[in-house]
């Protein structure tokens, strides 16, 4: 139960029943996405109440007036036409510029400290650390399969646990190089603000900077076959000392 408490109560880094909001952010790009969502939601709420007030006012005036068609000879109103043309344009600009800025910032991959190659297969992920060698002087690499429900430990998350986690150091610029070996997959970890399609024969890349320790869960987000739901992703962020110890054990 300790694992479940740490993952779901202290930090919401995994899907939870009846969840209605984002998982807790662990990277600057995810914090930016949450802030953008909240700002856009503010505009949407204002629009909702504004349009609702106008609609209710029209209905009330229509019901209370003696002549239901008292404005049948009104052809146009220049002022109101300007208002309903300019106001949406201004709102769209206020939404567009922050989203464009965030989009370009998320697309930048500058001077990463290390790289991880993630390759999607039917139906598992394989990972490679091209910057580090194991005891056989080969790149550190491994496959990551879902843990069957019959093998889950108490407190583990169903359909989300894997046999081999991706271990990364916190406070480090990491570049994920993402591809696929058969069909199209998608590498998605909500707490990290990462969602990148994996195409056979093509390399995509995303940058992450994990600002705290934790275990972050994701899944393949592109329908890729009958066991599409059996491709979880688990990334564990640890201190630099623990990461170096893990490297020595490989």
UniProtKB/Swiss-Prot annotation:
Function, as annotated, reads: Component of the cytochrome c oxidase, the last enzyme in the mitochondrial electron transport chain which drives oxidative phosphorylation. The respiratory chain contains 3 multisubunit complexes succinate dehydrogenase (complex II, CII), ubiquinol-cytochrome c oxidoreductase (cytochrome b-c1 complex, complex III, CIII) and cytochrome c oxidase (complex IV, CIV), that cooperate to transfer electrons derived from NADH and succinate to molecular oxygen, creating an electrochemical gradient over the inner membrane that drives transmembrane transport and the ATP synthase.
InterPro entries in the cross-refs: CcO_II, CcO_II-like_C, CcO_II_C, Copper_CuA, Cupredoxin, Cyt_c_oxidase_su2, Cyt_c_oxidase_su2_TM_dom, Cyt_c_oxidase_su2_TM_sf
User: Which proteins does it associate with, and in what oligomeric form?
Assistant: Component of the cytochrome c oxidase (complex IV, CIV), a multisubunit enzyme composed of 11 subunits. The complex is composed of a catalytic core of 3 subunits Cox1, Cox2 and Cox3, encoded in the mitochondrial DNA, and 8 supernumerary subunits Cox4, Cox5a/Cox5, Cox6, Cox7, Cox8, Cox7a/Cox9, Cox6b/Cox12 and Cox6a/Cox13, which are encoded in the nuclear genome.
NCBIfam families, sorted: CoxB
Q: Which cofactor does it need?
A: Cu cation
EC numbers for this chain:
7.1.1.9
Where in or outside the cell it occurs: the entry states: Mitochondrion inner membrane
Q: Which PANTHER family does this entry report, sorted A to Z?
A: CYTOCHROME C OXIDASE SUBUNIT 2, CYTOCHROME C OXIDASE, SUBUNIT II
Name a single GO cellular component. mitochondrial inner membrane
- Which positions in this protein are listed as binding Cu cation A2? 220, 222, 224, 228
Q: Which family does it belong to?
A: Belongs to the cytochrome c oxidase subunit 2 family.
Task: State the species of origin.
Answer: Neurospora crassa (strain ATCC 24698 / 74-OR23-1A / CBS 708.71 / DSM 1257 / FGSC 987)
Q: Name one GO biological process term.
A: mitochondrial electron transport, cytochrome c to oxygen
The molecule here is called: Cytochrome c oxidase subunit 2
Its topology with respect to the membrane?
Multi-pass membrane protein
Q: Which UniProt keywords apply?
A: Copper, Electron transport, Magnesium, Membrane, Metal-binding, Mitochondrion, Mitochondrion inner membrane, Respiratory chain, Translocase, Transmembrane, Transmembrane helix, Transport
Q: Where does Cu cation A1 bind?
A: 185, 220, 224, 231
Quickly give the catalysed reaction. 4 Fe(II)-[cytochrome c] + O2 + 8 H(+)(in) = 4 Fe(III)-[cytochrome c] + 2 H2O + 4 H(+)(out)
Q: Where does Mg(2+) bind?
A: 222
